[in-house]
């Protein structure tokens, strides 16, 4: 019995001893792993550099090894093979210890107290040294260029230099959103960033995760404490551009992608690049940039009144990357990047869309079949573009939503109007759309209208059968039997009295249908109309009848173009030949006027003039087309001749006789001017003296620009000025001017202001002066014998003026009516 107990105790002691050894080995392994961690190894490397201690493996190249080490036999092939075998042996020992630790992990609580760190250091000092050598050799061999590492080892960094000197070489740090900026900013070129990427390869973070971390902030802090700028990746810009193209700028998916970009520390230049690449048109980018600058200006004014001194330095140039901040945008405070992203996204949401009524919230109305939630979304989106994401505008938006909603939604909201917008959405979620009473009623009425339209089928007026109209009927025509080719146009199978063609098969213009035709539709002819100029009461073209050659009761005669003519704006006024009218006697007077339809509707301008029928010749009419090209065909009726009929029944004027230019009498005062000299006249206009030449051919007076005071206002006239030259838009006085002659005569006129060498006084001044032209007292005897004979028949008496009773009247001369149609007129 005693032997059995002794055996059990001995077995238990052996078991405890074995567990003790296993636990001891496990704790030693933990200490080794802790000492070989990245941070501890960096601290030891920094300590060695601080005290000038150099690693014995400074490089494998011959140029970096001292000659003394080569003479002592270090780093020879035998030494390298020995150390390599030692490293493999150490790996096997660590693997065996790890296997034993996994077997006894459940008995961790049965072990003795852990060994002190000093004992562990003494026991594994040699192993630790070998591990450091192995790690340094591993880093130097595969993850860092030899030249860069040699420079770093030859120039150790002083202790405490830089804010991040205690961190291991190559570690990438992400700055907090509102942390203080490092003292220095380093913009690394591409080659240095590749070197930094190699130095970060000894991190425990996988390379894919490191790439995602780099995307988080295009501006990030490097390993040496400086900031590095990395551009936004191509895939992110591509996804944003595709989202804008497929869904639009304000789609939810597009805005979510912008919110993801807002979490990054994007510089102003980055935002401009991203927006320019994402928006489809350059005009949209310019609109966004203008809105962004406006919002940045408002944000800069708010920053100037901030409490913190850092935020007061965030000016407009800083937020937009202009001025002194155009070259270096990575040294901003971390909070400034958040403001830049906020202003950029806010202005993105404010971009206008084609066809929308932006800025008019009262026009956002809920449709009859639109759900209440969609209507609220449209109203909220339109309000955000005007007010931004402001809570102060929430009451106004709610009031507009209530007023612009449908009648059913307002009835549901009214009992709980003070509950808020979220409660309105819950109550009205089933209202709106085609399933409401109003929607069902509209659908029922629409279906009834469709059924009624199906039953109300019209029948053919030719055959009387339903299903088609007369124009599509294939049955023979009841009125005329079998149809033949039209004798009028020659282009279709229909009767001539039903022809609606404007031109025949040869291109000639057809006359309008006769109003006395046997077949006239009930609603009038609905076919095409004549393409020529319209005539008020008469057709423009058509067969000329003999009755049109004679004066009608209205005393108007239509004149036809004698040939084809083309008028253009740059041609100014051109004479257009017209056909003479042989039925009018010679000496007939008339006034040429344009037709209303031709002048007003078609753009042709016929300039009025007095026309006297002389000997048979080729007559012409002055026409122009200032608004476009106008084509005149031969035979078109363009001008009208308004005949001036004789007036033999005119009574004598009972009032005082008014003598004006053109009248003469015994008591008339004459101004005799010799034609050897230029007839000059000096006038005082608005207190200033002007000297000019009398021009009987000018309707309006003209003042030279050399005489015109600069203080007097002028404007451009809408009428053209035609004389020896042509002026399309002449300058004219803006106000009426008062003139006064040396004899006290006064009047008002509105002169033209043109660059002429002299001033010209026209008939607007000479009429008020009472000037006349006369050759009665000419040295050659005055009028010719033929003229005196004609004047004698009209009642002229030499030396007593022109007129029957020497009355000097101003009305037109009334010739004696002759039955043989001779003289100036006829009764």
Swiss-Prot record:
In this chain, composition skew of type Polar residues spans 515-529
Ranges annotated as CCHC-type zinc finger: 458-475, 484-501
Q: Where is the signal peptide?
A: 1-25
The disulfide bonds in this chain are none
Q: Which GO terms describe its molecular function?
A: aspartic-type endopeptidase activity; nucleic acid binding; zinc ion binding
Q: Where is this region: Disordered?
A: 108-143, 504-556, 800-827
Keyword Zinc-finger tagged: yes
Q: Where is the active site?
A: 695
Q: Locations of Basic and acidic residues compositional bias?
A: 800-809
Give one Pfam hit by family name: Gag_p24
Chain positions of site Cleavage: 22-23, 217-218, 261-262, 441-442
Q: Which residues form the Peptidase A2 domain?
A: 690-765
Q: Name the PROSITE patterns for this protein.
A: ASP_PROT_RETROV, ASP_PROTEASE, G_PATCH, ZF_CCHC
Which BP terms does GO give this entry? proteolysis; viral process
Q: Name the residue ranges with Acidic residues bias.
A: 119-133
What this protein is called in its record is Intracisternal A-particle Gag-related polyprotein
This protein's gene is called gag
């Amino acid at each position: 019995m005693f032997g059995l107990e002794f055996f059990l105790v001995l077995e238990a002691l052996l078991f405890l001893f074995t567990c003790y050894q296993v636990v001891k080995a496990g704790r030693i392994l933990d200490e080794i792993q802790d000492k070989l961690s990245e941070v501890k190894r960096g601290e030891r490397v920094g300590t060695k550099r601080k005290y000038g201690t150099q690693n014995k493996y400074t490089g494998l190249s011959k140029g970096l090894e001292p000659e003394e080490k080569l003479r002592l036999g270090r780093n020879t092939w035998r030494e390298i093979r020995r150390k390599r075998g030692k490293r493999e042996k150490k790996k096997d020992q660590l693997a065996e210890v790890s296997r034993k630790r996994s077997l006894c992990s459940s008995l961790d609580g049965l072990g003795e107290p852990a060994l002190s760190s000093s004992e562990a250091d003494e026991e594994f000092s040699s192993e630790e040294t070998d591990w450091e050598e192995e790690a340094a050799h591993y880093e130097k061999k595969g993850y860092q260029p030899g030249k860069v590492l040699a420079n770093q080892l030859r120039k150790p960094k002083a202790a405490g230099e830089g804010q991040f000197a205690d961190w291991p070489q190559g570690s990438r740090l992400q700055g907090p959103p509102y942390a203080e900026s490092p003292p220095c900013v380093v913009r690394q070129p591409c080659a240095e960033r590749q070197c930094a990427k190699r130095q970060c390869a000894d991190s425990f973070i996988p390379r894919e995760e490191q790439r995602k971390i780099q995307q988080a902030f295009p501006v990030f802090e490097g390993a040496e404490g400086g900031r590095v700028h990395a551009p936004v990746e191509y895939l992110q810009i591509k996804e944003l551009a595709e989202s804008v193209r497929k869904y639009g700028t304000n789609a939810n998916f597009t805005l979510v992608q912008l919110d993801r970009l807002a979490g990054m520390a994007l510089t102003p230049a980055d935002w401009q690049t991203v927006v320019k690449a994402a928006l489809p048109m350059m005009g949209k980018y310019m609109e966004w940039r203008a809105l962004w600058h406006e919002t940045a200006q408002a944000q800069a004014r708010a920053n100037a009144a901030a409490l913190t001194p850092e935020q007061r330095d965030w000016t407009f140039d800083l937020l937009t990357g202009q001025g002194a901040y155009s070259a270096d945008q990575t040294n901003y405070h971390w909070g400034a990047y958040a403001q830049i992203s906020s202003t950029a996204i806010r202005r993105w949401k404010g971009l206008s869309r084609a066809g929308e009524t932006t800025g008019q919230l009262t026009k956002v109305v809920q449709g009859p079949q639109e759900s209440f939630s969609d209507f609220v979304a449209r109203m909220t989106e339109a309000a955000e573009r005007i007010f931004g994401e402001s809570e102060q505008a929430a009451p106004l938006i709610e009031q507009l939503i209530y007023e612009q909603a449908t009648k059913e939604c307002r009835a549901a909201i009214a009992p709980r109007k003070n509950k808020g917008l979220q409660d309105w959405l819950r109550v009205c979620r089933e209202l709106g759309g085609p399933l409401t009473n109003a929607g069902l009623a509209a659908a029922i009425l629409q279906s009834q209208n469709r059924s009624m339209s199906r039953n109300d089928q019209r029948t053919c007026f030719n055959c009387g059968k339903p299903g088609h109209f007369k124009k599509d009927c294939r049955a023979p025509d009841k009125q005329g039997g079998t149809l033949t080719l039209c004798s009028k146009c020659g282009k279709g199978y229909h009767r001539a009295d039903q022809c609606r063609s404007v031109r025949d098969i040869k291109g000639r213009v057809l006359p309008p249908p006769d109003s006395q035709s046997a077949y006239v539709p009930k609603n009038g002819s609905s076919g095409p109309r004549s393409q020529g100029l319209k005539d008020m009461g008469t057709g423009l073209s058509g067969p000329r009848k003999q009755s049109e050659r004679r004066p009608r009761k209205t005393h108007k005669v239509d004149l036809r173009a004698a040939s084809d003519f083309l008028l253009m704006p740059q041609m100014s006024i051109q004479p257009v030949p017209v056909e003479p009218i042989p039925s009018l006697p010679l000496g007939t007077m008339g006034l040429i006027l344009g037709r209303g339809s031709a002048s007003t509707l078609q753009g042709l301008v016929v300039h009025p003039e007095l026309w006297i029928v002389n000997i048979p010749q080729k007559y012409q009419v002055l026409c122009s087309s200032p608004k476009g090209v106008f084509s005149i065909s031969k035979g078109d009726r363009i001008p009208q001749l308004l005949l001036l009929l004789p007036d033999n029944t005119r009574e004598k004027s009972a009032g005082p006789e008014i003598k004006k230019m053109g009248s003469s009498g015994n008591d008339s005062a004459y101004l005799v001017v010799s034609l050897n000299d230029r007839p000059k006249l000096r006038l005082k206009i608005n207190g200033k003296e002007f000297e000019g030449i009398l021009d009987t051919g000018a309707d309006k007076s003209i003042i030279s620009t050399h005489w015109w005071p600069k203080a007097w206002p002028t404007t451009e006239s809408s009428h053209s000025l035609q004389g020896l030259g042509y002026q399309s838009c002449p300058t004219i006085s803006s106000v009426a001017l008062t003139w006064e002659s040396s004899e006290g005569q006064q009047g008002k006129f509105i002169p033209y202001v043109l660059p002429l060498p002299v001033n010209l006084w026209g008939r607007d001044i000479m009429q008020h002066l009472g000037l006349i032209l006369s050759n009665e007292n000419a040295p050659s005897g005055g009028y010719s014998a033929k003229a005196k004979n004609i004047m004698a028949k009209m009642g002229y008496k030499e030396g007593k003026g022109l007129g029957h009773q020497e009355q000097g009247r101003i009305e037109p001369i009334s010739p004696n009516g002759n039955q043989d149609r001779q003289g100036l007129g006829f009764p």
